[in-house]
A protein has these predicted regions:
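Active-site beta-loop-alpha junctions enriched in small/polar residues
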Residues: 17-23, 58-62, 126, 151-154, ...
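Histidine/acidic-residue-rich catalytic or RNA/ligand-binding cores of hydrolases
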Residues: 1, 132-136, 157-163, 184-195, ...
Length: 255
């Protein structure tokens, strides 16, 4: 946990996160409160962590995610043995429907805390309609730090036009990850279409590596940025998408 390993003399800021999967309490305020508490046992009595962190909507327990991986939370193609993955029966993954009052109320409890403490919201592996609903409700509550989690990923599959609308209407950044190219068979042509539609101010470039077969963060980003430069993306735009935009989301004042 970042709150437990962070040191006063750190020269590089460490930023934590929590994903609201079932094993963290699901989509409600429980996981957010745990993150705010610094992961202390009694989250109601703990002091609130002063540092901003990322709150992801569900990822590997989403019904949309499970449909992509034969009902397993983790794909064996990622280098994980099947016995270390979890199988979810049809329909048991997380789903969000605006007609489900209980689930929407639980979502709102999580969003209220994210807004109250000015945290960063990432949309996780929700499907297209679920993603749009979360962004819509988050923005209405005043949340301004919003990331569309690798929105070309097969569980979500937003179009570049939709990403453009999410940026202009809600200020939601579209994330393009190096790892999705190999793992999920996405292409640089698809990434270029997103950059063209949204513009560098509304895009985040990240590695999302850490798998046993992936390059290091440094090597992956070096390759990633080099491929964009070969395709005509200016260095200033790469800096915008990989440094300035994340810095704004994490550390700068936003209104």
């Amino acid at each position: 946990m970042v709150s437990q390993i962070r040191r006063p003399d750190d020269t590089v800021p460490l930023v934590g996160s929590v994903a609201l999967n079932y094993n963290c309490g699901g989509v409600d305020d429980h996981g957010v409160r745990a993150g705010l508490s610094g992961w202390k046992r009694d989250v109601t009595a703990a002091d609130v962590d002063r540092d901003r962190f990322v709150v992801w909507m569900p990822t590997m327990c989403c019904e949309a995610h499970l449909r992509c991986y034969n009902r397993r939370d983790i794909s064996t193609a990622w280098g994980v043995k099947a016995e270390y993955t979890r199988f979810y029966a049809e329909g048991t993954g997380y789903q969000l429907d605006r007609a489900d009052a209980a689930k929407v109320a639980a979502l709102d409890r999580a969003l209220d805390l994210i807004h109250q403490y000015d945290l960063i919201l990432a949309t996780g592996h929700l499907d297209r309609n679920e993603t749009l609903l979360v962004v819509e409700r988050a923005y209405a509550k005043g949340i301004r730090r919003i990331i569309l989690t690798h929105p070309l990923f097969q569980s979500t599959e937003l179009t570049p036009e939709t990403m453009h609308r999410m940026w202009t209407q809600y200020g939601a950044y579209s994330e393009l990850c190096f790892s999705n190219l190999a793992m999920d068979h996405l292409t640089y042509d698809q990434y270029m279409a997103v950059i063209e539609a949204v513009g560098a101010p509304g895009v985040l470039l990240s590695s999302d590596v850490g798998q046993i077969f992936s390059p290091t963060v440094g090597d992956s980003l070096r390759e990633f940025f080099g491929e964009f430069q070969k395709r005509g993306i200016k260095e200033d735009d790469i800096v915008q998408m990989s440094v300035l935009n994340p810095n704004r989301l994490l550390f700068e004042a936003m209104s």
